């Protein structure tokens, strides 16, 4: 199985082609990338990586402000350490157009809901990740334009060729 999984390489998204200089991003996608990378705006890259990390995840466990108390202890259930309660592994955002519902428990059906959570829905708890710098303000408070542009960028990470590859069907 591991050998097969090593053949599953997604690297033909619009953003991948942009990095290779083959195409341009729309203004919305480009602004969305800037929102993603800007610590004063989206500040998404700490957990979900950047164009220097083709996996688009740090593969680490974080409490991203979903709850103030935890029915699901997350990583804390594995380690037994209460400091790990509410921490879940950051997923790759590559091909996220195909991975709804979102979050560890599927609580968000749409990308808009996910973006709204980080924008104005953060919940403070004793184990909140220090990377959630705006938790005391409830989130990063993106404008509607920045939210729309961030979504456009995130969707540019969709590799339809990979998803539709007949070698990986059934």
Predicted features and spans:
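Short glycine/threonine-rich turn/loop motifs
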Residues: 13-117, 122-129, 165-170
């Amino acid at each position: 199985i591991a050998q097969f999984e090593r053949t599953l390489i997604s690297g033909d998204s619009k953003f991948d082609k942009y990095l290779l200089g083959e195409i341009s991003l729309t203004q919305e996608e480009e602004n969305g990338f800037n929102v993603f990378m800007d610590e004063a705006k989206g500040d998404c890259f700490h957990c979900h990586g950047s164009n220097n990390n083709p996996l688009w995840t740090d593969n680490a466990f974080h409490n991203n402000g979903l709850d103030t108390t935890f029915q699901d202890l997350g990583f804390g259930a594995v380690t037994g350490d209460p400091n790990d309660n509410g921490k879940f592994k950051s997923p790759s955002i590559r091909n996220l157009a195909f991975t709804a519902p979102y979050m560890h428990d599927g609580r968000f059906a749409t990308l808009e809901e996910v973006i709204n959570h980080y924008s104005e829905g953060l919940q403070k708890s004793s184990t909140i990740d220090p990377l959630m710098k705006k938790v005391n303000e409830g989130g990063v408070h993106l404008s509607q334009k920045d939210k729309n542009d961030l979504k456009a960028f995130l969707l540019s990470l969709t590799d339809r060729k990979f998803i539709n590859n007949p070698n990986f069907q059934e």
